[in-house]
C-alpha cells in the first residue's frame, strides 16, 4: 500500500475546498502536458462536477522542455481567473510563483504537493512572492527549517 495520495485525489481535495470557500471562483489552470498534469486536472474537474465547465475559465499547458512559462502566466492573468490551480514540477512552480508576483497577479494560488518544497521552490521564487499559497502536504519537508530540530528526523 502506497503512502502518497494519488494526483486525482489531491485534485478532488482542492476542488472541495474551492467549492466550499469560493463557490463563484474563476479558475485558471496551468498543467504539465503529460499524464502527471492531466491526472491533477482530471481530479479537480471530477471534484468540481457539473460546476467545472462554468468555473474553469482557462487551461494552459507547458512542456518539460520549455525554458519558461511566462507567457502561460500572462495568459491566465488575462483570462480573469481569480483562482490559480498550479500543476507544475518544482522548476516551473518557482517560475509561476515569481511571474505572478512580478506582474501583480494575485489569485488564490493552489500549488500541488509535488512542488511545495520550501528549499527548491518557495525560496527560489522568493518567500515574499510565495506568501498565501495553498497546498497540501503528507510528509515533513527536510528543507523547511521548521523541522530542523524535530525528533522524528
Label for each model-derived stretch:
Residues 1-103, 146-148:
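Extracellular/periplasmic Venus flytrap/periplasmic-binding protein
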Residues 5, 100-153:
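Extracellular/periplasmic periplasmic-binding protein-like sensory domains
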Amino acid at each position: 500500500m502506497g503512502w502518497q495520495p494519488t494526483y486525482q485525489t489531491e485534485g478532488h481535495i482542492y476542488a472541495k475546498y474551492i467549492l466550499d470557500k469560493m463557490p463563484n471562483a474563476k479558475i485558471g489552470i496551468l498543467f504539465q502536458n503529460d499524464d502527471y498534469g492531466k491526472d491533477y486536472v482530471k481530479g479537480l474537474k471530477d471534484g468540481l462536477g457539473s460546476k467545472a465547465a462554468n468555473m474553469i475559465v482557462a487551461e494552459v499547458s507547458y512542456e518539460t522542455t520549455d525554458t519558461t512559462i511566462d507567457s502561460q502566466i500572462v495568459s491566465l492573468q488575462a483570462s480573469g481567473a481569480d483562482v490559480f490551480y498550479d500543476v507544475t514540477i518544482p522548476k516551473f512552480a518557482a517560475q509561476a510563483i515569481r511571474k505572478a508576483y512580478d506582474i501583480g497577479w494575485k489569485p488564490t494560488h493552489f500549488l500541488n504537493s509535488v512542488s511545495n518544497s520550501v528549499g527548491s521552490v518557495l525560496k527560489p521564487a522568493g518567500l515574499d512572492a510565495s506568501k498565501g499559497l495553498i497546498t497540501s502536504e503528507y510528509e515533513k519537508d527536510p528543507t523547511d527549517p521548521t523541522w530542523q530540530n524535530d525528533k522524528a528526523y
